């Protein structure tokens, strides 16, 4: 038996709240309506499409892991992070990121993606870049996707954490950098190293 539009929309909302990863096709089958009807219902209820729902759930999860800066201040979109070990972000180069005359990305956007990822990977309330050694290895053009990969590689005697960031378009390296990071809270790390040395 077909449900009224109001009843279907109420159930649709409940179903998506229970399982934000359900597709429009699965919803259409569940409610015996067309995919287009589901899309119209979602629009009326201001429920985003599956991709946006997945992104929202992932960002909420990542926001809990990133302590050093608000997730919305990260340049690019963090897709994976293991605090004090590694992180990955993606950055889609759009028209506002390139020089108008040649459609090449401005370098400060690539640096900002790498630098903010180096900050985000630090598991501390405050992390600042003390020093950076960077290299641009090829031009990045409009509509290319830059994948930045950060890895914590060590710690200096002065307590600063060393983070290496390599950025790629496809398999091609386009940017590399070594970031020396100041962090405000050294007690935990110092305690860990003392335990390991005993």
Curated annotation (Swiss-Prot):
GO terms for biological process: fatty acid biosynthetic process; negative regulation of DNA-templated transcription; negative regulation of fatty acid biosynthetic process. GO terms for molecular function: DNA binding; DNA-binding transcription factor activity. Signal peptide: none annotated. CDD domains: hot_dog. Disulfide bonds: none annotated. Residues 102-169 form the MaoC-like domain. Keywords: DNA-binding, Fatty acid biosynthesis, Fatty acid metabolism, Lipid biosynthesis, Lipid metabolism, Repressor, Transcription, Transcription regulation. InterPro entries: HotDog_dom_sf (IPR029069), Transcription_factor_FapR (IPR017275), WH-like_DNA-bd_sf (IPR036388), WH_DNA-bd_sf (IPR036390). It comes from the Bacteria. The keyword Acyltransferase does not apply. The keyword RNA-binding does not apply. Transcriptional factor involved in regulation of membrane lipid biosynthesis by repressing genes involved in fatty acid and phospholipid metabolism. Belongs to the FapR family. This is Transcription factor FapR.
């Amino acid at each position: 038996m077909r449900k009224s539009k109001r009843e279907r929309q109420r159930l649709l909302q409940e179903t998506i709240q229970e399982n934000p990863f359900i597709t429009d096709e699965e919803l259409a089958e569940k409610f015996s309506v067309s995919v287009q009807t589901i899309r119209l219902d979602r629009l009326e209820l201001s429920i985003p499409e599956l991709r946006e729902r997945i992104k929202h759930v992932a960002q909420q999860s990542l926001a809990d892991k990133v302590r050093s800066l608000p997730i919305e201040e990260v340049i690019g979109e963090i897709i994976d992070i293991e605090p004090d070990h590694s992180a990955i972000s993606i950055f889609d180069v759009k028209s506002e990121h390139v020089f108008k005359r040649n459609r090449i990305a401005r370098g400060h956007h690539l640096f900002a993606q790498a630098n903010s990822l180096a900050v985000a990977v630090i598991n501390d309330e405050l992390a600042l870049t003390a020093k950076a050694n960077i290299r641009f290895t090829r031009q990045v053009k409009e509509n290319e996707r830059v994948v930045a990969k950060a890895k914590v590689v060590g710690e200096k005697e002065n307590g600063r954490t060393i983070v290496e960031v390599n950025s790629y378009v496809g398999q091609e390296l386009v940017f590399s950098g070594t970031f020396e990071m100041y962090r405000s809270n050294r007690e935990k790390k110092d305690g860990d190293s003392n335990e390991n040395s005993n």
